[in-house]
Swiss-Prot record:
Organism: Xenopus laevis (African clawed frog)
Subunit structure as annotated in this protein's UniProt entry: Component of the PAF1 complex, which at least consists of cdc73, paf1, leo1, ctr9 and rtf1. The PAF1 complex interacts with PHF5A.
Record-given protein name: RNA polymerase II-associated factor 1 homolog
Keywords for this protein: Coiled coil, Nucleus, Transcription, Transcription regulation
Similarity field: Belongs to the PAF1 family.
Compartmental location: Nucleus
Pfam families registered for this protein in UniProt: Paf1
Biased composition (Acidic residues): 375-384, 420-436, 448-461, 468-481
The gene coding this protein: paf1
Domain of life per record: Eukaryota
Primary role: Component of the PAF1 complex (PAF1C) which has multiple functions during transcription by RNA polymerase II. PAF1C associates with RNA polymerase II, is involved in transcriptional elongation and in histone modifications including methylation on histone H3 'Lys-4' (H3K4me3).
Gene Ontology terms: cellular component: Cdc73/Paf1 complex
């Protein structure tokens, strides 16, 4: 065989192939595996086994006595960072006779711009729209020159104009004229939007209080998510939610919550039958509702702090628009059931309707009377004026007789006028005090629902007694007429306050009774 010559590259290739020979992988099993079958499934379902030990025994931390007895040092400055000299009070006293520095006086001077007289200076702020600036990016200041109107001046002028445009009702006459203006404005035809001149009305409908439904107190319930049932959708879900009920419940631990009940299939059929027949309910039928959700609640009503009035509108075809009041606002949030606490998922609400009893009917009538407020105020004012004038005439006769019989019948008119002025001041003060007491009592009645009207009656009696004293002290016929005018004013103001407070007390007590009673349904 002829000799061959190998190059250095061939020698390296042969050496590299011999050095990187693959080693066969060994199996992890000593013996040879014959079968490769997988394990069978567990013949029964997995189960939860109760853990008999306390779950917190490995993680619960208890402080030792050394940690409890140790006192941590609070390293702070002795003056807490506030350097105040409490010993010498003259340290921070300012001398009123001190002279300011010349540089500081410049800061206190007002900037007064002298009127520019030269024609050249007047051309500086002139805007020439057809001229192009050489810089593409420029501010408003650079584009339109120096502006003499400062933003501070603009803000001050706008605030002043706002105050002049707004009607600030400071006195009684301006308030009365503003109230009367609202009635006149309501009679005017609406031709355009109040803030958008191009928007015109499509249809104009009158708005009235809902006398039909005002007797029933309404509440606004706000859910944090859609309470619709999961197994229903569309019109079926809306029909079920329209017949839903909420009731307060309590779990085994004594925690209160709100349960949301939905009607069953049998109840839905009964409610549809009642609607077709035009009935509110069937007296002998029983309606079943099953619990669907559990909520925590937050309630706000008229007695709550920060309460805001809320109304809703009802559009009735061919009749108009009616508004009603939402006295209560309820916010519902989903309730988290604690571990180990049995929830009321199987709770069933059984409802059987009945007729309303006397207290509920009285509460409805009180709400209707509160809305109508049909007190004949003018007739009452006339009757009160007549009574006061008759009593004042009798008192004037008694006073004139006493003056004829008495030895001091020739007193000066100035003294009687002075006494009359003092008595008028006393009457005004007592009227103010009685009005403040009435207002405080009315607020208290709205919150606590009391039915006491003795304060207003006492104020009326005080007004009549004071008027009697005026009649006895006055001597001349003119003073008697003045006393009659004062007495008629005080007497005409106080009885209406008592009647109004009495009416509000009846309304409040009736509303409290209505809220405490059920809405015409017994739930088991």
């Amino acid at each position: 065989m002829a000799p061959t010559i190998q190059t250095q590259a061939q020698r390296e290739d042969g050496h590299r192939s011999s050095s990187h020979r693959t080693v066969p992988e060994r199996s992890g099993v000593v013996c040879r595996v014959k079968y490769c079958n997988t394990l069978p499934d567990i013949p029964f379902d997995p189960k939860f086994i109760t853990y008999p030990f306390d779950q917190n025994r490995f993680v619960q931390y208890k402080a030792t006595s050394l940690e409890k007895q140790h006192k941590h040092d609070l390293l702070t400055e002795p003056d807490l960072g506030v350097t105040i000299d409490l010993i010498n009070p003259d340290t921070y006293r300012i001398d009123p006779n001190v002279t300011l520095d010349f540089a500081d006086e410049k800061l206190l001077e007002e900037e007064i711009q002298a009127p520019s007289s030269s024609k050249r200076s007047q051309q500086h702020a002139k805007v020439v729209p057809w001229m192009r600036k050489t810089e593409y990016i420029s501010t408003e200041f650079n584009r339109y020159g120096v502006s003499n109107e400062k933003p501070e001046v603009k803000i001050g002028v706008s605030v002043k104009q706002q105050f002049t445009e707004e009607d600030i009702y400071k006195d009684r006459d301006s308030q009365i004229s503003a109230i009367e203006k609202t009635f006149d404005d309501a009679q005017k035809d609406i031709s355009q939007h109040y803030s958008k001149p191009r928007v015109t009305p499509v249809e104009v409908m009158p708005v009235f209080p809902d006398f039909k439904m005002w007797i029933n107190p309404c509440a606004q319930v706000i859910f944090d998510s859609d309470p619709a049932p999961k197994d229903a959708s569309g019109t079926a879900a809306l029909d079920m939610m329209s017949q839903a009920m909420i009731r307060g419940m309590m779990d085994e631990e004594g925690n209160q919550f709100v349960a949301y009940f939905l009607p069953g299939e049998d109840t839905m059929r009964k409610r549809k039958r009642d609607q077709e027949e035009g009935l509110d309910y069937m007296p002998e039928d029983i309606y079943d509702y099953k619990i669907a959700r559990e909520y925590n609640w937050n309630v706000k009503n008229k007695a709550s702090k920060g309460y805001e009035e809320n109304y809703f509108f009802i559009f009735r075809e061919g009749d108009g628009v009616y508004y009603n009041e939402l006295e209560t606002r309820v916010r519902l949030s989903k309730r988290r059931v604690k571990a180990g606490v049995q929830s009321g998922t199987n709770a069933l609400l059984v409802v059987k309707h009945r007729d309303m009893h006397e207290k509920e009917l009285e509460a409805q009538e009180a709400r209707r009377a509160q809305l109508e407020n049909h007190e004949p105020e003018e007739e009452e004012e006339i009757e009160v004026d007549r009574d006061t004038q008759g009593s004042d005439a009798e008192e004037g006769e008694k006073g004139s007789g006493s003056e004829k019989e008495g030895s001091g019948a020739e007193q000066s008119g100035s003294e009687s006028e002075r006494e009359g002025a003092e008595e008028e001041e006393k009457e005004d003060e007592q009227e103010k005090e009685s009005s403040e007491d009435d207002r405080a009592a009315r607020d208290k009645e709205e919150i606590f629902g009391s039915d006491d009207d003795d304060d207003d009656d006492d104020s009326d009696e005080d007004g009549h007694n004071e008027s009697g004293q005026d009649g006895e002290d006055s001597g001349s016929d003119e003073e008697e007429e003045k006393g009659q005018g004062r007495r008629s004013r005080s007497a005409s103001s106080s009885p209406f306050g008592s009647d109004r407070s009495q009416q509000e007390n009846e309304d409040q007590s009736a509303s409290d009774q209505g809220s405490g009673s059920s809405d015409g349904s017994d739930s088991d």
